[in-house]
Amino acid sequence: MTSLLIINGPNINMLGKRDPSQYGELTLHDLETLICEHAEQLKITTKCFQSNHEGSLIEFLQQNSEKASGIILNPAGLTLNGYGLLDACIDSK
């Protein structure tokens, strides 16, 4: 069965609370629920994870990437300087 890792970086846990006019009213839980429900219809399993700490994101990626068919990563605030996370992504081929 196809499986996806859904990984979200810093401050994504604040969706729905932080400036709804810019980020919307859906919470991270709401989005994860929508993703998981849609994936289930496609017979895809999902494993969602969010952290505000780059090291935790790297550990999750390293511990789970070999079992996953694919990875969807929103690095959020780490987009510009998350070199450790980038290296972990490259190594997760």
State each model region's role.
Residues 12:
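Active-site donor-nucleotide binding/catalytic segment of nucleotide-sugar enzymes
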Residues 15-29:
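Glycine- and acidic-residue-enriched helix-capping/strand-helix junction motifs
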Residues 41-90:
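Helix-adjacent hinge/juxtasegments
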